[in-house]
Amino acid sequence: MKVWLFSDLHLEFADLRQPRTIPDADVCVVAGDLCRAPANGVHWLGKNVAHAMPCIYVAGNHEFYKGSIKEGLEDGRAAAAQFPNVHFLENDFVMIDGVRFLGATLWTDYRIEGHPDLAMVYARERMNDHKLIAEQRNPWKRFVPETAFRMHQESRLFLTSVLKADPIKTVVVTHHLPHAKSIPSRFEGDLLNAAFASDLSEVIEVGRPALWLHGHTHDTCDYRVGSTRILCNPRGYGDENIAFDPALVVGV
């Protein structure tokens, strides 16, 4: 199977009315931060890509800016129901041609730099996620690091349990980073890394998915943990990432 991977197009800042190219692939995977609001991302994929291949889409943090997670997920699922070829996943999976795709935003556990309590305080002060995102609209609740931690734990449990249940060929798609090797070297030691990445080494090594595809960082990466290949192919803001390949296709 050939998988077309990209993330972090950030259409809310630099509009692309349609992809510059649609490569020869069997499945399109979008690892978050496509645009503002999950439903808008679903509609963009339904209009521009789904005619060519099935689409796997997970929300990034920016999908929820100036909105809420609860209602955003509900709206994304409702929109995806209109497009049989667009699969919007949050702690959910879909089978395509014998390959299982697991999807979740993932968020973080704030532990990767070794000071989770301090990292949560730092994230609350520094991350726009906790200024521009609500957990829910009615009744209104702010999205706080404690909620991100809880949601991360829920996603980690989902991924672990499904990977253990049946060892079939699997692709995991998350927005947040699953391993420290995905953190760009220029940010080494930065406490804010804990709001971007978590160490899921055990999940990866025990579950052994064929691929783990993610976004969030605006730096390309491609490496292995055990038998699992981990990739990120983000565009970033405008043409921020010069290594971005809009037609990247990987095999599974």
Predicted regions, residues:
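N-terminal active-site segment of His-dependent metallophosphoesterases
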Residues: 1-58, 64-73, 135-138, 142-145
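Beta-strand-turn-beta hairpins that frame and shape the catalytic cleft
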Residues: 1-4, 93-103, 224-229
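Active-site neighborhood of phospho(di)ester-bond hydrolases with catalytic His/Asp-centered motifs
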Residues: 5-7, 28-33, 56-61, 87-91, ...
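Active-site environment of divalent metal-dependent phosphoester hydrolases
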Residues: 10-16, 36-40, 62-73, 93-95, ...
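Glycine-rich phosphate-binding loop signature in dinucleotide/nucleotide-binding domains
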Residues: 22-23, 96, 162-168, 206
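A basic- and aromatic-enriched beta-loop-alpha substructure that forms the phosphate/nucleotide-
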Residues: 56-122
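Binuclear metal-dependent phosphoesterase catalytic core
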Residues: 81, 184, 190-210, 218-252
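Active-site-proximal loop/helix segment associated with metal-binding centers of metalloenzymes
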Residues: 102-171, 178-187
